[in-house]
Amino acid sequence: MQPTKWLEENDANLINDLSKLVGVQSISTDGAHQKELDDCAELTCTLMKSAGLNNVAVLKTGNSNPYAYGEWLGAPGKPTVFLYAHHDVQPVMGFESQWQSPPFTLTERDGRLFGRGAADDKGAIVTQLGAIASYLQTKKELPVNVKMLVEGEEEVGSSNLQGFFVENKDRLMSDVIVVCDTGNAEVGLPCITYSLRGIVELKITVKSATTPVHSGSAGGMLADAAIALNVILARLYWGHKKLPVPGIYDKVRKLTGTEKRAFRKIGGEEPKWRSDFGVLDGVELALESKVHPNEATWRKPSITVIVEAASSVAGKSNQVLPEALAYISCRIVPDQDPAEVFEQIKAVLTKDPPWGVKVEVTPTAQMKWWMTDPTGPSFVAATKALKKGFGVKPVNIGCGGSIGFVGPLAELFGGAPALLLGIEDPISNAHAPNESLHAGDFRKLTASISNLFEQIGNLPDGKVK
């Protein structure tokens, strides 16, 4: 039996495997689901064994959440492919009523598979294991060696991952990296991501007094920290121009003419973007004038206020608030320096504070951008595999998000090519209510990865770069 035939005959089993994974509430963001994280790692190991992987184990480093690991090293002389996915997910708290079906019950509807983690990133676990099983259950061997790692703390920043890689370098060393944690620009259009934005996150705290004061006594006299904070944050408003942060564009790498033309061909027109992101009628897209959405989200810096707090609804009172805070996330692009960008934003936020309030700005997280040249033997192999799996030639795209380990891991592996293959699409709603995975693309990606093993295994002299 051919691997493709095996995938067709075992489609229901693969969907069932995904259903089992989605059913485990492996939420890593709140510290209250450690048992579920452990259970999900164990379940992933069980699925690895069923697919035919060897040396399967739950691994940890320090106080990390569990990793699931398995390997098959029965192809001497052939390249080794490192597969990455993650089994932890985002919570649904506060948005349960917006789900049209139970978030932790995989539900097929309108050609899509709904459930928390279906797209991000449990679907990737099943596509990778399905591709592995399609060979090991039919040919009893793979065209390449495979090492597979499924992480348990991606959704909380992967703080232990780099240390885990260094600690287990010899065990993990591979020739090609394959990550399925990015998106496709459209349903049915396979995409290879060759750039990722980085991130600079910071906290701003504004203080005006040592204690709250009754607004009847001090309202109109005492500086309101919440208003002062919002006056400061308003300095970041860009309208339809560039970000009003001096120096922030100085090192931004310009798009080539080829990139600009390619980006404008992908992803549709404004009505599609508005529909995909649920933009309300009458609300403008906040684009810089004459900049295409793909260019804006893939290769331009952006600034977002992700948390703002001064009090709570439950604790509301007629007081002048003495303290307010916000967290700001800035996405950075090639060739920006995270430390420089932090200082540039800090300078804007701390200059001439309203009413002379005390302003403190501190860094909370930084992650470098990543970019590679999407050519060379491994990228040719991926292009062929995706074209065979999807029936459409793939396109090369950027990603507005961040996957911080890709660059350091490629470097640790001696400059290994990193293939970032899309599993999500514009309406997957990762992290949001009604997260879903397109069932057809799920099957096509599984077939593509199966074929990718063959394409890499057939590279002349095993040269992957």
Where are these regions (language model features)?
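N-terminal helical capping/dimerization or prosegment-like subdomains
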Residues: M1-E96, E323, Y327, E340
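A generic structural motif
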Residues: A119, T210-P212, C330-P338, M367
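Polar, glycine-rich mid-to-C-terminal structural blocks
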Residues: L202, A209, V213-S275
